[in-house]
């Protein structure tokens, strides 16, 4: 049969598929094997199902029909998803396991059994993410976007990097010695650090040090490049190039990069008298949650690795050795607006004609007739405009809204806050 598939808005293509399943009779539920209708085996495990979804996200990074920089974005999304999964879902299961909780999930697995399966699958997923990044890195280089190492730097590169380092990086660094006289610093959630093994030049005395990498600095430093090309250096490589400026009189003998993921599961007492204060306290407590995953670069000196794991109180499968880049979520920083040829074409959603007829007045447009918006084909700006107008309209006395997820600087939240400041009753149910 002929089937028309909608691939992008207003573009169609026709292909032949076998769709006999559409006309096949459905099985009688009573004829299904008992194992499929009764007992825990009829359920998918919630956590393993989520990992399967994230495998599907990563598949888009391996899909050659997807533009190159969009594939890079999918690796970043997959890595960020896994980070969130570790800090919330895995953290919750670990807490249950530590408490000795053996209550099975709907599919019949205890927290310990689930953690074992999760760790095995998550490690495979991380390896596949690194493999996808290595393959994509070669394709990017063929398109004139190169991620170089410090060994490939020219004298001109080093001169340019020295200016960047002194002006933008050096002032915000805080190198720290690791010894009994200096307590191990607090490493925030998703924090990346360099662990260094050095010896003093004058007498060979050993020194272990830590160099936390500030999150506000871009993960990749742009290098001089011919017109039409892009060359970048990972920030940790830049720091190693300038290690003598940070530790004068010492020689580097070994190093590794590591990253910390902390328990970010939020627990609040919903019956608390002051819910706002309860959330503020919970958020502060979450910043210092215990470590649920430690990622360490492969080949780390054993003494450094031992020191880090002991200081962060992590053991066993909480430690993951990474062969490749640590913190793949920040690959999104390589997506460049000046390479539209490597991204999906821009899609401009339509503005409903009725809103235009009423010169943007949402209330008048809705008063004429109820409005149904289809996202992303019709712009979400209409929702933002509706709330912003409601926040300022003297006839609006209350706003009640459900919020699933918002951006860091959400215009929705801004409009709700403005409405509350204008004396309106505002209620939001937040996921």
What is each model feature region?
Residues 2-431:
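N-terminal localization/anchoring segments of enzymes in phospholipid and broader phosphate metabolism
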């Amino acid at each position: 049969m002929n089937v028309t598939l909608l691939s992008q808005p207003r573009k169609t293509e026709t292909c032949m598929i076998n769709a006999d399943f559409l006309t096949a009779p459905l099985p009688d539920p009573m004829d299904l094997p008992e194992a499929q209708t009764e007992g825990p085996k009829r359920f998918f495990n919630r956590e393993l199902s989520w990992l399967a979804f994230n495998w599907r996200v990563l598949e888009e990074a391996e899909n050659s029909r997807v533009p190159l920089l969009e594939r890079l974005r999918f690796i970043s999304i997959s890595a960020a998803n896994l980070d969130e999964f570790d800090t919330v879902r895995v953290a919750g299961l670990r807490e249950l396991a530590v408490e000795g909780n053996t209550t099975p999930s709907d599919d019949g697995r205890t927290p310990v059994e689930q953690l074992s399966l999760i760790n095995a699958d998550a490690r495979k997923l991380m390896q596949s993410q690194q493999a996808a990044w290595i393959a994509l890195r070669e394709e990017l280089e063929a398109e004139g976007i190169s991620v170089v190492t410090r060994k490939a730097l020219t004298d001109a590169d080093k001169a340019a990097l020295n200016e960047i380092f002194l002006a933008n990086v050096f002032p915000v660094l805080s190198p720290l010695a690791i010894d009994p006289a200096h307590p191990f610093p607090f490493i925030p959630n998703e924090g990346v650090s360099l662990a260094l093994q050095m010896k003093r030049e004058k007498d060979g005395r050993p020194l272990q040090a830590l160099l936390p990498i500030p999150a506000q600095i871009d993960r990749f430093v742009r290098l001089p490049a011919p017109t039409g090309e892009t060359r970048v250096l990972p920030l940790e490589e830049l720091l190693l190039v300038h290690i003598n400026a940070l530790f004068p009189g010492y020689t580097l003998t070994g190093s590794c990069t590591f990253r910390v993921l902390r328990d970010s599961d939020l627990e609040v007492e919903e019956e608390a008298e002051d819910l706002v204060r309860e959330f503020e306290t919970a958020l502060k407590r979450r910043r210092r949650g215990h470590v649920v995953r430690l990622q360490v670069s492969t080949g780390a000196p054993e003494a450094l690795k031992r020191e880090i794991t002991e200081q962060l109180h992590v053991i066993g499968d909480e430690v993951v050795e990474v062969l490749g880049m640590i913190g793949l979520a920040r690959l999104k920083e390589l997506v460049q607006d000046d390479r539209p040829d490597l991204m999906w074409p821009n899609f401009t959603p339509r503005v409903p004609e009725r809103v235009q007829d009423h010169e943007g007045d949402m209330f008048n447009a809705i008063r004429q007739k109820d409005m149904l918006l289809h996202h992303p084909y019709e712009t979400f700006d209409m929702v933002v405009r509706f709330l912003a107008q409601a926040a300022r309209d003297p006839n609006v006395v209350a706003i009640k809204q459900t919020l699933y997820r918002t951006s860091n600087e959400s215009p929705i939240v801004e409009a709700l806050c403005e409405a509350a400041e204008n004396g309106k009753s505002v209620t939001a149910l937040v996921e």
